[in-house]
Amino acid sequence: MESTHETWDLATSVGATATMVAAGRARATTTGLIDDRFAEPLVRAVGIDFMTRWATGDLAAADVDIPGATWGMQQMTDLLAARTRYFDAFFGDAAAAGVRQAVILASGLDARGYRLDWPAGTVLFEIDMPDVLEFKGRALTDLRAEPTAEVRMVAVDLRDDWPAALRAKGFDPTRPTAWSAEGLLPFLPPEAQDRLLDAITSLSASGSRLAAEVALLGSDSEDGALGADGARDLEPLLARWREHGFDLDLGDLGNSGPRNDVDDYLEARGWTSTRTPLAALLDAAGLEVPRPADGRKSLSDNYYSTAIKG
């Protein structure tokens, strides 16, 4: 399926955020917070020097972070660790409930199909840009990684007819499915978020589950996906990254403007949802919760949603 949209790879634009996530996972693996042995070699394969140094520990948080700043490399690593634990547990809970079909939307450098202990008979579909999946497939082959589920790559842009591409790979909408939208929704325009959730709903049998990361900052403003407060939190961090040779503006990559609340939207369509603030995930992992000194909202106020289809 050929897309007419702008494309990117794992070293540029939105694709670089997938490499950033893997770098954070690699760093968190060294502390025992998570276990992703594929994260570091995948980051190395992409070849962004800054991200490789982050992943390996050659670049310490103290080298980059600004004392007293709300967010820095250490806080970003903690966020990604807590987020990874949440989605790992989500898939584990779904498997325990008997779900044997899973879909990872915008999978990037996600290696759950190779590192999680999936029950026998589980089919895992990974959806992402063709170049991204081709790169990851080659890298995992070079690493001699063995899948722990039946992994099926669905190479399609989420702005195109991805449900058709998913069905073409053998997806069965009559079976309960575990869906994940990790680090995805803030990058979608508000109307595209609704279309994605509608498509997931139409493809989901009773008992299906969806886990999603929901960014509250910027959801009701025109100040970028992070909102004015979120951008203010991250700008010192991103400025230091630029000094070390890596230039990425997370606010520019997302989509701002009023959008429907994910939990409310899903519940109106037959799902029952539970939200967990990022702050609670950090606290449960024994990690510091970053809070601005002036008490304004921050990234810690974003939430994670798990919804079950009735």
From Swiss-Prot:
Indicate whether Transport appears among the record's keywords.
Answer: no
Please, which domain of life does this record's source organism belong to? Bacteria
Question: Which SUPFAM superfamilies does this UniProt record tie to the protein?
Answer: S-adenosyl-L-methionine-dependent methyltransferases
Molecular function GO labels: methyltransferase activity
EC no.?
A: 2.1.1.-
What InterPro entries does this protein's entry cite? Ppm1/Ppm2/Tcmp (IPR007213), SAM-dependent_MTases_sf (IPR029063), SAM_mthyl_Trfase_ML2640-like (IPR011610)
Q: GO:BP terms for this protein?
A: methylation
Q: What class of enzyme is it?
A: transferase
Q: Which family does it belong to?
A: Belongs to the UPF0677 family.
What the protein does comes down to:
Exhibits S-adenosyl-L-methionine-dependent methyltransferase activity.
Its recorded name reads Putative S-adenosyl-L-methionine-dependent methyltransferase MSMEG_1888/MSMEI_1848
* Native species: Mycolicibacterium smegmatis (strain ATCC 700084 / mc(2)155)
